[in-house]
């Protein structure tokens, strides 16, 4: 998940100006939808997104707004749930909002973006990393974050440098987690690193003893997990309880203050391909 920085602020302003050329707006203000997870298991990332978008709007307004108009935030909660995201997107349409910062999770961003594209609504996601999102030729969909197919290879090359004996690649069966895990697995194979296991776990499950027993039986010494911090936290805690000494690694979705303080964990971030 990325912070909205000056570049994102500039992009937001540019997109609004481009939109103004297409839409006749007589109002003194421009409503900006902010769509993401206010509730649900990854609400902490949603809080970062909402805070960053609010800050960008404040900064733009402090400089006179866009085309002399002040920006007004309209906030929507999709809980990172695809069905709720579709409901949010339809509400955005019904509310007459023409610009959206969001959504957060790839699995909720993609179905929402279909609606925005059809309705001519500009959408900028600061967090959805699935390559599929911007590979469909859509004209109204943008992002300010890197792609899983760039982060995955970078993570795999880092793992290869550590020279593990047996690697397990786990994921949460979601678009974001499984996508980046698949990328890691593919590159590890090309790097000559044995992937002993590639399996999905169920989001929201409280007991991962079965998968951890498999890891231990396979003598896994390194685990890459594609997903978010709630599941990673449980995996780490239960692995320690069962005496599993493997090192763990995950993408930015597992970044969390409490998890980052635990030993034997590496966290990667979205990145650009090496040139």
Q: Over which residues does each language-model region extend?
A:
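Gram-negative bacterial Sec-dependent N-terminal signal peptides
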Residues: 2-25
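Extracellular/periplasmic Venus flytrap/periplasmic-binding protein
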Residues: 87, 130-132, 139-243
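Venus flytrap/periplasmic-binding-protein-like
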Residues: 78, 124, 131-133, 245-264
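Short helix-capping segments at alpha-helix termini
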Residues: 60-68, 118-121, 188-194, 240-245, ...
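Beta-alpha junction/loop-to-helix N-cap segments that form part of ligand/metal-binding clefts
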Residues: 44-51, 59, 63-138, 144, ...
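Immediate post-signal peptide segment of exported/extracytoplasmic ligand-binding proteins
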Residues: 25-34, 65-70, 160-163
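Short beta-strand segments enriched in small/hydrophobic residues
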Residues: 29-46, 103, 166-170
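Single conserved hydrophobic/aromatic residue that forms the stacking wall/gate
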Residues: 265-275
């Amino acid at each position: 998940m990325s912070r909205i920085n000056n570049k994102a602020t500039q992009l937001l302003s540019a997109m609004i100006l481009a939109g103004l050329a297409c839409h006749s707006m007589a109002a003194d203000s421009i409503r900006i939808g902010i769509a993401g997870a206010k509730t649900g298991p990854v609400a902490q990332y949603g809080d970062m997104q909402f805070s960053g978008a609010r800050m960008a709007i404040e900064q733009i307004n402090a400089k006179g707004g866009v085309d002399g108009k002040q920006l007004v935030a309209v906030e929507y909660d999709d809980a990172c749930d695809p069905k709720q995201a579709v409901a949010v997107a339809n509400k955005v349409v019904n509310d007459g909002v023409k610009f959206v910062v969001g959504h957060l999770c790839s699995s909720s961003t993609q179905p929402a973006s279909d609606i925005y594209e059809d309705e001519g609504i500009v959408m900028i996601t600061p967090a959805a990393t699935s390559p599929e999102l911007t590979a469909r030729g859509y004209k109204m969909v943008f992002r300010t974050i890197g792609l899983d197919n760039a982060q995955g290879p970078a993570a795999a090359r880092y793992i290869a440098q550590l020279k593990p004996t047996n690697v397990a690649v786990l994921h949460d069966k979601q678009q974001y987690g499984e996508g980046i895990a698949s990328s890691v697995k593919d590159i590890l194979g090309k790097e000559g690193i044995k992937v002993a296991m590639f399996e999905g776990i169920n989001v929201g499950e409280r007991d991962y003893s079965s998968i951890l027993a498999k890891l231990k039986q396979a003598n896994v010494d390194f685990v890459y997990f594609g997903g978010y911090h709630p599941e990673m936290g449980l995996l780490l805690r239960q692995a320690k309880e069962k005496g599993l000494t493997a090192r763990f690694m995950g993408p930015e979705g597992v970044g969390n203050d409490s998890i980052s303080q635990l030993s034997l964990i590496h966290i990667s971030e979205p990145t650009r391909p090496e040139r």
